[in-house]
């Protein structure tokens, strides 16, 4: 197959633009939270797998953390197990936790591993229970109204938060040229399982590894101002101002807090990426314009 002159010129431009970024990130670790539309479209799934394999091929170390909420919901429905949510979190009783483990640790995790491996990678699937990769504890949720003298504690079952990450295991896999693919299930002090928000797991893994980047794939173009324009580069201070003035609100707040915590915890930058764009991960790290919002501790020049 031959390229015409214009196509060949475009390929050369793309490679030329990518080269300084490749040099900058060789040997660095990037943690990518994979979810949303990027997990549902066959074209986007294939593009994501190729992106991950290419990153590894040029010397970058990707670590993938995935979600799977819709798939969990589908199986619960088929099993006639009712789903309840409190503050956006799935109430996870024992029966629901069994389904979460089956779907995240089994079906979804192995599908992603298989896809990456089919495109030339060496992915290995993990849950937080493997070698106690993600130690967790029960998440305490409270609610208080003006009439209450003390906050009400709400039991949402086997929902957890990260206590620690086994970085020795992840570093061993990365050095062995494997691509870790992590399901967000944590293990408690007594061996119990916890369902943990995938964004939070990705953020804590990035902090623990002192990753170069935390990349959160979403179903939006990035953080937007009140006029609907994408904000391509922000400092943590600017993000806090946008939260204070109500520009960032609702369902985006937990995701943004995770991105902020990661940067403040030692990650060089966090990225809110439009996962609906083919090859979004490569476009964000290897091009000048990117496809989302970059958050750092310092201003861009």
Swiss-Prot record:
Feature type site, description Transition state stabilizer: 33, 255
Main location: cytoplasm
Binding residue positions for substrate: 68-69, 90, 195
Domain of life: Bacteria
Gene Ontology MF terms: acetylglutamate kinase activity; ATP binding
E.C. numbers: 2.7.2.8
Annotated keywords: Amino-acid biosynthesis, Arginine biosynthesis, ATP-binding, Cytoplasm, Kinase, Nucleotide-binding, Transferase
Catalytic activity: N-acetyl-L-glutamate + ATP = N-acetyl-L-glutamyl 5-phosphate + ADP
UniProt keyword annotation of Protease present: no
Entries under InterPro entries matching the protein: AceGlu_kinase-like_sf, AcgluKinase_fam, ArgB, Asp/Glu/Uridylate_kinase, Glu/AcGlu_kinase, NAGK-C
Keyword Transcription among record annotations: no
GO CC terms: cytoplasm
Record pathway: Amino-acid biosynthesis; L-arginine biosynthesis; N(2)-acetyl-L-ornithine from L-glutamate: step 2/4
Subcellular location as annotated: Cytoplasm
GO BP field: arginine biosynthetic process via ornithine; L-arginine biosynthetic process
Function: Catalyzes the ATP-dependent phosphorylation of N-acetyl-L-glutamate.
Family recorded in the similarity comment: Belongs to the acetylglutamate kinase family. ArgB subfamily.
Protein name, entry field: Acetylglutamate kinase
Lineage of source species: Bacteria, Pseudomonadati, Pseudomonadota, Gammaproteobacteria, Pseudomonadales
Gene: argB
């Amino acid at each position: 197959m031959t390229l015409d002159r214009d196509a060949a010129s475009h390929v050369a431009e793309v490679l030329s633009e990518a080269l300084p970024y490749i040099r900058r990130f060789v040997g660095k670790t990037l943690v990518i939270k994979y979810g949303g539309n990027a997990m549902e479209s066959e074209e986007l799934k294939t593009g994501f797998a190729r992106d991950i394999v290419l990153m590894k091929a040029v010397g970058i170390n990707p670590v993938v953390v995935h979600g799977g909420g819709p798939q969990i919901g589908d199986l619960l429905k088929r099993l006639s197990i009712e789903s309840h949510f409190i503050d956006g979190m799935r109430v996870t009783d024992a029966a629901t936790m069994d389904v979460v483990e089956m779907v995240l640790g089994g079906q979804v995790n192995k599908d992603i591993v298989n896809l990456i491996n089919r495109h030339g990678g060496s992915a290995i699937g993990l849950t937080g229970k493997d070698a106690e990769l993600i130690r967790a504890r029960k998440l305490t949720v409270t609610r208080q109204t003006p009439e209450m003298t003390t906050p009400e504690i709400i039991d949402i079952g086997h929902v957890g938060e990260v206590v620690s990450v086994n970085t020795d295991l992840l570093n061993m896999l990365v050095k062995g040229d494997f691509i870790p693919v992590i399901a967000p299930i944590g293990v408690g002090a007594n061996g119990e399982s916890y369902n943990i928000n995938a964004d939070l797991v990705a953020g804590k893994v990035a902090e623990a590894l002192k990753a170069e980047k935390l990349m959160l794939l979403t179903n939006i173009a990035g953080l937007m101002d009140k006029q609907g324009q994408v904000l391509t580069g922000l400092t943590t201070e600017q993000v806090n101002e946008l939260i204070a003035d109500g520009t960032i609100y609702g369902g985006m707040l937990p995701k943004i807090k995770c991105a902020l915590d990661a940067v403040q915890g030692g990650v060089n930058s966090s990225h809110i990426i439009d996962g609906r764009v083919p090859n979004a991960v490569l476009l964000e790290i290897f091009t000048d314009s990117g496809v989302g919002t970059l958050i750092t501790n310092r201003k861009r020049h």
